[in-house]
């Protein structure tokens, strides 16, 4: 079957491949026929040791997607043949990812999703959405508190803005001027140009928490957090704690219950996404665009 991935361990070049269909599902596993699969900057880590997801090349990349269950292993509960599911899976039980036609998935990591929702929009949700949710859980903010998000224009930052705003949190975000109107529509009370050398001065400080979604901003954001506040970094660069501030790095984990809630938020209009669909056969170009920042702020989604 067609796949976009790597041919050997440590390879960084991504190509169109022909790989075998996944094996029959084992206990607690399902095979999913892919409708759409998300592409993210994290995918470059899957075959270089940065994120060990159990990839066994030649294999497809990708750790998120949506599709129909076409085989069900023993011991699976709540998921049946023909169900439509959305998943972020890591490690990958079949040693191969979602950028293909079929993939083996851990059933406990899959959430049932309605037929009416656009597969391209759904496939853009798992990794970024789960990261945003899990970061906000760590920060533990309540209505009326203030949150600083660096890179609010990115896929994770934009979802975090929307989720925080729904909870009544006041959000200030850094982003490009071209993204400012969109982020205000999402609920940001203030958007600061990240290219302004004095952006941290403009932010004024006194935030209850900071969410770091772009490398190199954590040390400038920390002084803007009040004593006893929180900082959560998504870029593995949380600075040492000071002034009683809890400073932590967060790494996304699969969570079907959180995916179900995100899907509900999407269906009920509380979340908005604008991903760009790309044919699976154009996957190498899509991967390169993501790594070089040529996506115009859109999440790219591969469609077989």
Predicted regions and their residues:
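C-terminal hydrophobic helical "lid"/dimerization subdomain
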Residues: 1, 259-304
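Glycine-rich beta-strand-centered segment in the early N-terminal region that forms part
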Residues: 21-38, 50-91
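NAD(P)H dinucleotide-binding glycine-rich loop of Rossmann-like/cofactor-binding domains
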Residues: 78, 88-151
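Mid-domain Rossmann-like dinucleotide-binding core that forms the NAD(H)/NADP(H) cofactor-binding site
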Residues: 125-193
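Short acidic-hydrophobic, aromatic-tinged amphipathic segments that line or gate anion-handling sites
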Residues: 190-195, 278-281
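A short acidic, Gly/Pro-enriched loop at the edge of an enzyme's catalytic core
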Residues: 202-209
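Glycine-rich phosphate-binding loop and adjacent beta-alpha segment
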Residues: 215-271, 303-304
């Amino acid at each position: 079957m067609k796949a976009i991935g790597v041919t050997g361990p440590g390879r960084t070049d991504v190509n169109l491949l022909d790989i075998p269909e996944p094996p029959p599902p084992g206990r607690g596993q399902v095979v999913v026929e892919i409708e759409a699969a998300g592409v993210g900057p994290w995918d470059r880590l899957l075959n270089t040791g940065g994120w060990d997801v159990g990839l066994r090349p030649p294999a497809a990349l990708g750790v998120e997607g949506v599709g129909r269950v076409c085989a069900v292993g023993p011991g699976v509960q709540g998921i049946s043949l023909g169900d439509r599911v959305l998943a972020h899976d890591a490690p990958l039980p079949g040693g191969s990812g979602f950028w293909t036609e079929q993939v083996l998935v851990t059933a406990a990591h899959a959430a049932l999703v309605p037929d009416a929702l656009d597969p391209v929009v759904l496939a853009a949700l798992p990794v970024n959405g789960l990261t945003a949710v899990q970061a906000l859980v760590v920060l533990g903010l309540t209505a009326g508190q203030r949150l600083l998000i660096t890179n609010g224009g990115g896929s994770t930052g934009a979802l975090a803005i929307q989720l925080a705003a729904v909870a009544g949190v006041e959000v200030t975000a850094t982003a490009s001027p071209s993204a400012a109107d969109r982020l205000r529509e999402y609920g940001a009370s203030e958007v600061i140009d990240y290219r302004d050398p004095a952006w941290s001065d403009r932010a004024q400080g006194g935030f209850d928490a900071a969410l770091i979604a772009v490398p190199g901003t954590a040390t400038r954001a920390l002084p803007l957090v009040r004593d006893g506040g929180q900082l959560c970094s998504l870029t593995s660069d949380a600075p040492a704690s000071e002034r009683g501030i809890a400073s932590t790095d967060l790494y996304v984990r699969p969570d079907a219950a959180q995916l179900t809630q995100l899907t509900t938020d999407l269906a009920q209009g509380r979340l908005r996404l604008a991903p760009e669909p790309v044919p699976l056969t154009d996957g190498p170009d899509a991967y390169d665009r993501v790594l070089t920042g040529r996506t115009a702020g859109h999440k790219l989604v591969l469609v077989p």
